[in-house]
Amino acid sequence: QTCALPISLYGVQTLRAMENFPITGVLLADFPELIIALAQVKEAAAQANMALGLLDAKLGTVIIRAAREVQHGRHHEHFRVDMIQGGAGTSTNMNANEVIANRALELLGYARGSYDVLHPNEHVNLSQSTNDVYPTAVKIALHRAIASLKDAMAALVGAFLRKGDAFAPHLKMGRTQLQDAVPMTLGQEFSAFAHTMQEDVDRLTEAQALIREINMGATAIGTGITAPAGYAEQVRARSEEHTSELQ
């Protein structure tokens, strides 16, 4: 079945996903952190493929340029798939592949959709699978989001502690089972809020350490099948460079 594409950087795979999975109305475009992370993964993959001689330098260069434009906040309106979809993020991965491929084609002077020149799967997704691209991008985006959340929570911890000091002289009744129980100070209550919040910050720090482990190069089922020798090491090294602030 043929599909009429609107004027857009995404392609037919994205359009079909939009038609097949209109589930929540919450779109990939609503999560810029994830889009940026996907573009960083695509850049790292292109660099690795170029280093191994698998991707023509001319094509690789424009793929990287297009991916960097996305990282700088451009073209996000073309990431239109629903966040809830069939598969393991395949539609999200293809949305990224098509946007980057079509923008790269424009940079080469070709019309969008000239996939005989530069293809979303054959070039942008070279040596990759949704099953390593998507979880890696999600982890990068989550790591950054957690960092921002921790900053906000740390500020709240500080505010609770200050109130704990300010309210130290003020007595109140502690309550259990919806009844007055024994006395405490209002300062103790706010200090307890601070302690509980700090424990949550510490748990988030532990979670950040766990999600720094990525599976780029493992491809579809974790064995690295279809990825050439040396690719996994190359793409992980490039990914580390692009996410150095997370180290």
Predicted regions located by residue number:
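Conserved, well-structured ligand/cofactor-binding cores
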Residues: 1-240, 244
